[in-house]
């Protein structure tokens, strides 16, 4: 199964200032990877499925989706967590970030860097999550500001420079060089999530398209043609696969940073190496209510594997909880699986003591990720 091949798993999220198009981006990625019907994406805003959210038009709960993307003849599993885009949801954002290894920072081409852009970059780097950049709403530069191709390039350059100024201030030392975003290196893409197109320098080289052609499509408002010539999902999912770390690589440097236990302990070693046969270690990012299955704990499995019937301990609680079902996400749908293994974003029912931030393990003595506050 693909979800056991750690080198082919990417756990990523999207983060942005409010209304810069993060949810539209997530939806159209999911849809592009073949999970939604064509006309609904964009209008339907698949990730914001709580009514409360749609009413406010902002993402409150980090929703999840898993997608399969083929790249150079190899299949990759991309687990996407939609991080809350609103500063009021700070605790949730930090937890969602902790479950990720890479993040797409979304910046509106017209508005540029905003206060919240800085906040989400800081949160990502604090959890050792590697950033790439997507400059969104590029069509608005022509529609509203009549920007020339040269001006457009300058604007992109300015946004990239500003993002890097924020990254360099907060990036962990060992990644100072590698984690700067760079159009030449393929860690920057630009486009319109709403109109379903994107491009990047590697993509243009691969498809033999130049920026002038892309600009002409925009100027003539040939949105459909542009989405066919430069599909959003292909450009971004390629960037995710090539430029963001796989689960096994990331856990080596992230676990010692985000976990408070001794990395020499067995469970520490098991997490650092994302071992499917070690004790299970599961960090809950949120608990969702399912009309059929009751409470479902969603989060990142850093070590071990979990199946129905397993006895699990919620840190700080005296009694074991018995697992009722395990699975993964496709959009708002939870797909039941026989077992779930280390390195994935998973959903588990039956953990009645779990709450957002809980650490859950088959090992009763495991040091939790977060301090337990009573």
Question: What role is predicted for each listed range?
Answer:
Residues 1-374:
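Structural and coupling elements of P-loop NTPases
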């Amino acid at each position: 199964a693909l979800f056991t091949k750690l080198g082919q798993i990417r756990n990523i999220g999207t983060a942005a200032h409010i209304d810069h198009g993060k949810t539209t981006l997530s939806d159209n990625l999911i849809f592009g990877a073949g999970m939604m019907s064509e006309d609904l994406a964009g209008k339907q805003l698949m990730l914001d499925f709580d009514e409360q959210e749609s009413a406010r038009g902002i993402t409150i709960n980090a929703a999840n989706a898993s997608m399969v993307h083929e790249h150079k003849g190899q299949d990759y599993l991309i687990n996407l967590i939609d991080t809350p885009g609103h500063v009021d949801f700070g605790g949730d954002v930090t937890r969602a970030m902790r479950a990720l290894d890479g993040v797409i920072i979304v910046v509106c081409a017209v508005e540029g860097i905003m206060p919240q852009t800085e906040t989400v970059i800081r949160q990502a780097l604090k959890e050792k999550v590697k950033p790439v950049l997507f400059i969104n709403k590029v069509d608005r530069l022509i529609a509203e500001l009549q920007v020339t191709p040269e001006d457009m390039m300058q604007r992109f350059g300015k946004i990239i420079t500003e993002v890097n100024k924020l990254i360099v201030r907060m990036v962990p030392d060992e990644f100072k060089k590698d984690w700067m975003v760079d159009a030449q290196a393929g860690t920057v893409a630009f486009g319109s999530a709403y109109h379903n197109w994107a491009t990047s320098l590697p993509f243009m080289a691969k498809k033999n398209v130049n920026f002038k052609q892309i600009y002409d499509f925009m100027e003539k408002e040939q949105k459909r043609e542009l989405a066919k010539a430069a599909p959003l999902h292909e450009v971004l999912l390629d960037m995710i696969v090539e430029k963001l770390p796989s689960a096994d690589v990331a856990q080596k440097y992230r676990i010692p940073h985000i976990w408070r236990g001794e990395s020499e302990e067995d469970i520490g070693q098991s997490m650092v190496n994302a071992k499917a046969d070690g004790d299970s270690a599961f960090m809950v990012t949120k608990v969702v209510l399912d009309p059929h299955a009751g409470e479902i704990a969603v989060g990142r499995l850093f070590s071990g594997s979990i199946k129905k019937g397993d006895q699990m301990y919620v840190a700080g609680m005296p009694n074991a909880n018995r697992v009722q079902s395990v699975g993964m996400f496709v959009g708002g749908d939870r797909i039941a699986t026989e077992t779930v293994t280390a390195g994935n974003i998973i959903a588990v029912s039956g953990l009645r003591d779990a709450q957002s931030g809980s650490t859950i393990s088959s090992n009763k003595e495991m040091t939790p990720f977060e301090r337990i506050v009573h």
